Amino acid sequence: MRRPALALAAIVLASPLAAQQAGAPFTVQETGQGYATLDEAVGSIRMGRGTILIQPGTYHECTVQAGGDITFKAVQPGSVTFDGSPCEDKAIFVLRGRSSTVDGIIFRGVRVPDGNGAGIRTEMGNLTVTNSMFLDSQEGILGGEPTGQQIVIDKSTFSGLGTCDEAPDCAHSIYLANKGSVTITRSRFEKGTGGHYVKLRVPNVRIVDNSFDDTGGAKTNYMIDLPEGGTGVIANNSFVQGRNKENWTGFIVVAAENRTYRSTGLRIEANDARLAPGEARSPAFVASYSRDALAIGDNRLGAGVRKFETR
């Protein structure tokens, strides 16, 4: 008779712990351990590998990943918002691990004194971002490292980002630099507030199946800026350039600052580029400073959009 009593007592004692774990906003999936703050959950993984499940809610906190391979995942995509509160005057997620994955999270309202407040600041390790949103901040995703870093962004939204008024050298919706590659697919860019929508200082790019809607933009510049050149593919994107531009002269601009990377064979094809109603200026769809032979294929260009110009 004592064994059932002991078993019942164990259940009763375990119940508060189980309830605590179930109610924790941040849980490491592999261990089932819950944490009150994201930083505690990140610290528990250390140099290992783990997935942090995040319960629905709005959080005013940030984290620095110092190592390991960590996935930050919303239990319900789109139900988790990190609002303001950057770490190190940089970003809500400052990433210095071996790799990082961000899945289903909203980043909003990030501002820092130097004008480069971002949802994500990647400083080390590969990065994958999927099904996430970056809203109303100085920058969306910023950073990179001088290695063969691989960055992949998929099914994400960038809105209300960028500034040249608050940042000395401008902030952008996405601004990345590495010696590896950046892939951006099935994502939406809209309502920019300055700078470029995508600025990449990388040797290899893949920008495919995205939507760039600049009709609600203000003081924006290029849709895609590859300031040091680069190869790869820009295809199947739709572009609409708005009227409120700081620099309206090109949609895609190659090697405007340096010819660090060869641009020979950069494929730009099957895109659709148009001007917003009432826009009378005539930008180039592609403008190149590189002197390399780009592979510009068939693109659908609306009235007033010129195919190509050499600068």
Q: Could you tell me what each predicted segment is?
A:
Residues 1-7:
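Bacterial N-terminal signal peptides that target proteins for export
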Residues 84-93, 113-121, 136-145, 165-176, ...:
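Extracellular beta-strand/beta-solenoid scaffold signature
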Residues 23-55, 60-61:
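Acidic Gly/Asp/Thr-rich repetitive segments characteristic of extracellular carbohydrate-active
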Residues 43, 47, 59-73, 81-103, ...:
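Extracellular beta-strand-rich solenoid/capping regions of secreted or surface-exposed proteins
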Residues 14-16:
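N-terminal signal peptide c-region/cleavage motif recognized by signal peptidases
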Residues 280-311:
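Leucine-rich solenoid repeat scaffolds
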Residues 55-56, 69, 73-79, 98-109, ...:
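Right-handed parallel beta-helix
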